[in-house]
Amino acid sequence: MEFSERRNINRGYRKLKVWQDAIGYYALTCEVFRAFPVVLQRLAAQQFASVDSIHRNIAEGYCRRSLKEYLQFLNFGLSSAGESVSGLHAYRNANQVSEVDFERLDAAAWKLENGLKRLIESLQSKQREGGWQESFVIRESNTAYHVAETEGRPSQRRPPVRGRKK
């Protein structure tokens, strides 16, 4: 998967294999459910929503930077994957999805669910060991921001107050 040059630490989730798998699962879901007849569009919309929320929860959790919140959102994504697979079983049993499409979607969901479970287990291990950095670390010089320093501290000069007559 290729990305634009617009990169920053907040967009790092795009490198995660589980996020890429979730995007692939969504694309495959669109391919299969786009062909649903009009009378089943509500069901198709529910399937789109459950699958779409997986990659969104992975990204949102990643961007939160708190390990507790990250794990919470990964678990939301895992729950959405379960919801989508439950729908697949119902659609297959009602002959609304072919066996071939069911197998393709179920295989993609299975791979994604296992990836999410491994990521969650890995992060829980880091949580137990205390090996998680919850803050953004900026390694730049203050001169890039034109910060005036007085005695080793940033200037305490206040901006002029507007609107008062002297």
Model-identified regions with their sequence ranges:
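Amphipathic alpha-helical assembly/interaction segments
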Residues: 1-166
